[in-house]
């Protein structure tokens, strides 16, 4: 007999493991169209969760993830039993994405949302040269580096963490501005920014030092400038098991050795 206390819509990464999990869960709890669902259940890794967060942005439908992938920082443990009870007891967190506007020499500006980060990285062996402006004021005249990123709290445990950036609580009203392999200023380790600021990154010597920009998985090649800010009218809700909340996850990650 199916448990129909919650109307669930399941999405999966398409791997054998996630499809098998989806089949078992649908048999037990049923499956409805996304527009009729109370909750979206994502099965896979963090990539699957990011796609679900993008797909269901501004729909008002919370997303509960279960790990059937290789990386699952945004996912809960996969357990078939008592899924509706776990969902109803889960902790809700609001995710607000960034909006990137990337400009190039010979094409219209490209706008894209990023839940994790907007990153710039060098296209060739030549280091990038980037001028960084915050709310109209130049804060760094020239950053020589392999790249630089603006990360959200949700994205602070991803590429940002690999680049030695800070981990941010989800509710923190902050963004992380983190360089990748900075050469000059050599000791500049990045900055924490109020979430309401607008960050502009202008590329210097673009013909000699081409740079690509990426908003999560949306790439724009050979950019001349990139503007990043929090998207003013976009949000989505993610659910975490209470015994494995975001706060617990970031504490565990910071004391991992």
UniProtKB/Swiss-Prot annotation:
Record protein name field: NAD kinase
PANTHER family the UniProt entry points to: NAD KINASE
Active site annotation, chain numbering: 46
GO MF: ATP binding; metal ion binding; NAD binding; NAD+ kinase activity
Keyword Metal-binding in annotation: no
InterPro entries in the record: ATP-NAD_kinase_N (IPR017438), ATP-NAD_kinase_PpnK-typ_C (IPR017437), NAD/diacylglycerol_kinase_sf (IPR016064), NADK (IPR002504)
Source species of the chain: Brucella suis biovar 1 (strain 1330)
Listed cofactors: a divalent metal cation
Catalysed reaction, written as an equation: NAD(+) + ATP = ADP + NADP(+) + H(+)
GO cellular component: cytoplasm
Residues where NAD(+) binds: 46-47, 116-117, 146, 154, 157-162, 218
């Amino acid at each position: 007999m199916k448990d129909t206390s919650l109307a669930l819509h399941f999405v999966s990464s398409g791997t054998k493991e996630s499809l098998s999990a989806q089949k078992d869960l649908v048999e037990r709890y049923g499956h409805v169209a996304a527009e009729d669902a109370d909750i979206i259940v994502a099965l896979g890794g963090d990539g699957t969760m990011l796609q679900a967060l993008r797909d269901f942005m501004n729909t008002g439908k919370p997303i509960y993830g279960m790990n059937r992938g290789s990386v699952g920082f945004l996912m809960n443990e996969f357990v078939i039993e008592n899924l509706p009870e776990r969902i109803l007891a889960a902790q809700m967190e609001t995710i607000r994405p960034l909006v990137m506007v990337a400009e190039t020499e010979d094409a219209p500006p490209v706008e894209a949302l990023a839940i994790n980060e907007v990153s710039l990285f060098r296209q060739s062996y030549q280091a990038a040269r980037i001028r960084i402006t915050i709310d109209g004021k130049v804060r760094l005249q020239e950053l020589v580096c392999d790249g630089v990123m603006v990360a959200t709290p949700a994205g602070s445990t991803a590429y940002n963490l690999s680049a030695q950036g800070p981990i941010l609580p989800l509710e923190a009203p902050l963004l992380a501005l983190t360089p990748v392999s900075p050469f000059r200023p050599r000791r500049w380790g990045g900055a924490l920014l109020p979430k309401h600021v607008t960050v502009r990154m202008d590329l210097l010597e673009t013909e000699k030092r081409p740079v690509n920009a990426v908003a999560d998985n949306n790439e724009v090649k050979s950019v001349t400038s990139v503007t990043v800010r929090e998207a003013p009218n976009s949000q989505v809700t993610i659910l975490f098991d209470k015994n494995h909340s975001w706060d617990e996850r970031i504490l565990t990650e910071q004391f991992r050795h």
